[in-house]
């Protein structure tokens, strides 16, 4: 049976079926159909949309940069990047002697809602200069659930959510990119692959994609 599955991977779960001695959880506990495997990966400390399939062709189709297949990430970072920093991300960052491919990077505005954030916490939107705000794109209506365990905030350091749209996926690439411009990533979610969005798929849940949803993934 040929299937393509969308899975909302929780924090602390490996993108593999066995733990190999790791303290993290593995995919085996989520009772996927037999003979499926993850297409690409998300680090254990990253969350969001992960695809699985028993059809090998999806791997090359979605992962090879020559197909320019988009993946969208939301990254919660320390401090508020300047327009120059966002432009630097978009043009490419040198990481370990290799420059990343050009991408899209923007400040999400309004900022995504996290259900357990205290109302008294200062909104990142209030920290934006007019010049920086001009680079903002609308965030989707996705409400982000709290992470378990929660991230550690530094009260003296503001944070905000960035959107990044990449066509490549090197090891810990988004985290290394934001760190290179002085904005360490606190939390990272993949919210879209091709035209398929994470939307309301609950954390830790998966679904077999319909024919129409498969077309969204493929960008058809």
Task: List each language-model region with its residue ranges.
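RNA pseudouridine synthases
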Residues: 1-121, 130-134, 141-220
């Amino acid at each position: 049976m040929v299937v393509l599955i969308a899975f909302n991977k929780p924090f602390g779960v490996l993108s593999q079926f066995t733990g190999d001695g790791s303290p993290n959880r593995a995919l085996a506990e989520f009772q996927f159909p037999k003979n499926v495997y993850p297409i690409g990966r998300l680090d254990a400390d990253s969350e969001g949309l992960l695809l699985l399939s028993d059809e090998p062709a999806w791997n090359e189709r979605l992962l090879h940069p020559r197909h320019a297949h988009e993946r969208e990430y939301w990254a919660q970072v320390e401090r508020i990047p300047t327009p120059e920093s966002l432009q630097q991300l978009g043009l490419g960052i040198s990481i370990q002697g290799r420059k990343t491919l050009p991408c899209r990077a923007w400040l999400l505005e309004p900022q995504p809602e996290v259900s357990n954030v205290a109302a008294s916490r200062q909104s990142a939107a209030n920290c934006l200069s007019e010049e920086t705000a001009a680079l903002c794109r609308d965030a989707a209506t996705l409400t982000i659930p709290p992470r378990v365990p929660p991230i550690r905030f530094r009260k003296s350091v503001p944070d905000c959510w960035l959107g990044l749209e990449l066509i490549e996926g090197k090891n810990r690439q988004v985290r290394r990119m934001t760190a290179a411009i002085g904005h360490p990533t606190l939390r990272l979610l993949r919210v879209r692959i091709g035209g398929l969005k994470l939307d309301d798929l609950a954390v830790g849940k998966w679904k077999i994609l319909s024919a129409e949803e498969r077309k969204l993934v493929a960008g058809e």
